[in-house]
């Protein structure tokens, strides 16, 4: 590669001319002796300087975002840089560290945060917050007041009611109970998923099956060394699907055997769900696409390339219709066989972290880094409710298994939201109001889960605590402090055990029976 000063000067001269700086161009041309150069200006295309600068900028962006082997750095998409950012010293190292910090926040894997939370105890008491919205159209709910609630008695779960499962060698990001038996699946940064057998029929205590996520290299299976980011059981409890940062989804039997490997994503998989019928699996990836897979053949039925940035979450509305959300701030509702979204919801002003259909499939809830929770209906383009009460990013949401179309039809439907502001909020969506604000946590809350009867809500935070709340009163009824920040909480089908996965590699099972 060679660059002469005459060539640089000519491109600058042409840029000044094309930009209307005629006097500056004349002066610069005289001082740099442009007329004496042997460059044929007729062969140089317009905007040549801008074009070559853009290519250089793209090269710096690639340096920041792509490893030497061509893979995305930390599985992140190429970030757009400004020209000034690109010429700053150490831009590659600075931006890569920023990526690591962002990833640490999203996955709550920052050891520093865990250490900071070690000696913190919840001193704030539980509160109740209600706010009134407008009667017609979209409801905008603001935080009006908080009344602190008393905690009833000693709520600490004794150690003999908590089983700590160890085996993972890195953070355990996710866990999920088998819907028909006491098998708990967990997924970790150690590139494994595990199936823990917690049935009381086992004479030797809990046992584990290790599901090693491998890729083919040189004709051999080698560990992928990538995080297991998502997992989901089918409704019959016979198969477990996992998604990984290596870009592959996998289907396993409950005995731990690999049944299928699903490979069409071009980057990490962030979310993965079975449909109720159990014939399709839906996945969302950093490659901006979502894919419906045939669970029987392992083949992709349809890929949906509608997002303009990484897809973060998906949820089925029916057996062939689903919603997806993205860092592009959009929500698409898509149907198998349709080549365009059947509905697009826009209104969030930052990344949309999670979406969930209510039990009837009529209302879709979404939460975002813009600190809002929105409720959408297929019957209209604008949101039905715009719920504003959290003062930091909302990480996840869950609907209660109550109301019409559920096994608990006489109980009111509720929505829970978990935020980086360390609070959990319970919402009455029909009225568009916050009915309880749960304020015991001291660090970001990453997971919430309703018990099967909807009477209790479990929450897990990076303060290492799992709290169990009464959904009717908002009272804290059980509390457990683990040894690592909590990423995920989940209830078993019987509603008497809560599983929790943690940043220190542990998986906890809390027995809530008397």
Swiss-Prot record:
Boundaries of each LisH domain copy? Answer: 4-36
**Chain positions of cross-link Glycyl lysine isopeptide (Lys-Gly) (interchain with G-Cter in SUMO2):** 277
The Gene Ontology CC terms held by the record are:
histone deacetylase complex; mitotic spindle; nucleoplasm; nucleus; transcription repressor complex
Q: Outcome of altering residue 351 to A?
A: Weakly decreases interaction with MECP2
Tell me the residues on which N6-acetyllysine occurs: 102
**All copies of domain F-box-like, residue ranges:** 41-86
This chain's protein is named: F-box-like/WD repeat-containing protein TBL1XR1
């Amino acid at each position: 590669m060679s660059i002469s000063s005459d060539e640089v000067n000519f491109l600058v001269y042409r840029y000044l001319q094309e930009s209307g700086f005629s006097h500056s161009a004349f002066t610069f041309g005289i001082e740099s002796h442009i007329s004496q150069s042997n460059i044929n200006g007729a062969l140089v295309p317009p905007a040549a300087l801008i074009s070559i600068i853009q290519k250089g900028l793209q090269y710096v962006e690639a340096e920041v975002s792509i490893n030497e082997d061509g893979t995305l750095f930390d599985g992140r998409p190429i970030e757009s840089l400004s020209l000034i950012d690109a010429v700053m010293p150490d831009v590659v190292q600075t931006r890569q560290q920023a990526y690591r910090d962002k990833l640490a926040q999203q996955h709550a894997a920052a050891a520093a945060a865990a250490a900071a939370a070690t000696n913190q105890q919840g001193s704030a008491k539980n509160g109740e917050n209600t706010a009134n919205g407008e009667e017609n159209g979209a409801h905008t709910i603001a935080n009006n007041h908080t009344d602190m609630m008393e905690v009833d008695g000693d709520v600490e779960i004794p150690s003999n009611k908590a089983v700590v499962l160890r085996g993972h060698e890195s953070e355990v990001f996710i866990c999920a109970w088998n819907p028909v038996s006491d098998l708990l699946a967990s997924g970790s940064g150690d590139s494994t998923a595990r199936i823990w057998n917690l049935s009381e029929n086992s004479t030797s205590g809990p046992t584990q099956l290790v599901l090693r996520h491998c890729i083919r290299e040189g004709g051999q299976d080698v560990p992928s060394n990538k995080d297991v980011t998502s997992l989901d059981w089918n409704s019959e409890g016979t198969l477990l699907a996992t998604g990984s940062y290596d870009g592959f989804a996998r289907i396993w039997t409950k005995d731990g055997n690999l049944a299928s490997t699903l490979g069409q994503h071009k980057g990490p998989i962030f979310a993965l769900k079975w449909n109720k019928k159990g014939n399709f699996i839906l996945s969302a990836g950093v490659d901006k696409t979502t894919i419906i897979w045939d669970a029987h053949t392992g083949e992709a039925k349809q890929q949906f390339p509608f997002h303009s940035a990484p897809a973060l979450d998906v949820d089925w509305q029916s057996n062939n219709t689903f919603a997806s959300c993205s860092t592009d701030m959009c929500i698409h509702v898509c149907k198998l066989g349709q080549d365009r979204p059947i509905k697009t919801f826009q209104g969030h002003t930052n990344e949309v972290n999670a979406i969930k259909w209510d039990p009837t499939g009529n209302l879709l809830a979404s939460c975002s880094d813009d600190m809002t929770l929105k409720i959408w209906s297929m019957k209209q383009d604008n949101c039905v409710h715009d719920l504003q009460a959290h003062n930091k990013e909302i990480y996840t949401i869950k609907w209660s298994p109550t109301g019409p179309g559920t096994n608990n039809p006489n109980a009111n439907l509720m929505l829970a939201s978990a935020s980086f502001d360390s609070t959990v909020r319970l919402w009455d969506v029909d009225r568009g109001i916050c009915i309880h604000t749960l304020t015991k946590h001291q660090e970001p809350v990453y997971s919430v889960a309703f018990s099967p009867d909807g009477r209790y809500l479990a929450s897990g935070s990076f303060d290492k605590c799992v709290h169990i709340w009464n959904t009717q009163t908002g009272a804290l009824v059980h509390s457990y402090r683990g040894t690592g920040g909590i990423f995920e909480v989940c209830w078993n089908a019987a509603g008497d055990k809560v599983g929790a996965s943690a940043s220190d590699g542990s998986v906890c099972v809390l027995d809530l029976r008397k």
